[in-house]
């Protein structure tokens, strides 16, 4: 397996500015030094290694998205509540006492909110 080439600084800066220093997925503000460049369509399923396929991501979103495409990541996130209710007693207790509140399985990413619900990456 070949090692991936580093993304040039100017390209990283362009990716960072796509969403004004926010994670394209969750919308969290991220410091430039902490931004990870994600491939919206993973390389392993034919995604390109270029700017139209890059998304600025926080460490957490990049970790959990891993090699999923955007719809796969959406599906993963939409199932989290059921999984937490099944597997996490502290989560169950927190929900019972109103500390956390279940809102919806409908996952809308930050980049979609900015673009009026349109799926896909910046072009």
Write out the residue ranges for each language-model feature:
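Short cysteine-rich loop/turn motifs with clustered Cys
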Residues: 7-35, 58
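Activation segment
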Residues: 34, 44, 65-67
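Short beta-strand-alpha-helix junction that forms the catalytic/metal-binding core
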Residues: 45-64
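Generic recognition of short, well-ordered alpha-helical segments
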Residues: 35, 49, 68-71
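Extended charged
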Residues: 1-10, 28-30, 55, 63-123
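Solvent-exposed, flexible loop/coil residues
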Residues: 34, 47, 113-115
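Short, intrinsically disordered, charge-biased short linear motifs at domain edges
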Residues: 6-14, 41-48
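Histidine-centered catalytic micro-motifs used for acid/base chemistry in nuclease
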Residues: 36-40
């Amino acid at each position: 397996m070949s090692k991936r080439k580093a993304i040039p600084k100017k390209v990283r800066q362009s990716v960072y500015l796509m969403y004004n220093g926010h994670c394209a997925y969750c919308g969290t503000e991220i410091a430039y030094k902490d931004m990870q460049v994600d491939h919206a369509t993973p390389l392993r399923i034919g995604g390109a290694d270029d700017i139209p396929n890059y998304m600025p991501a926080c460490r957490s979103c990049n970790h959990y998205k891993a090699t999923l495409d955007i719809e796969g990541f959406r599906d993963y996130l939409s199932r989290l509540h059921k999984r937490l209710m099944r597997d996490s007693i502290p989560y169950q207790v927190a929900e019972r006492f109103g500390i956390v509140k279940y809102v919806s399985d409908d996952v809308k990413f930050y980049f979609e909110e900015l673009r009026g619900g349109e799926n896909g990456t910046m072009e």
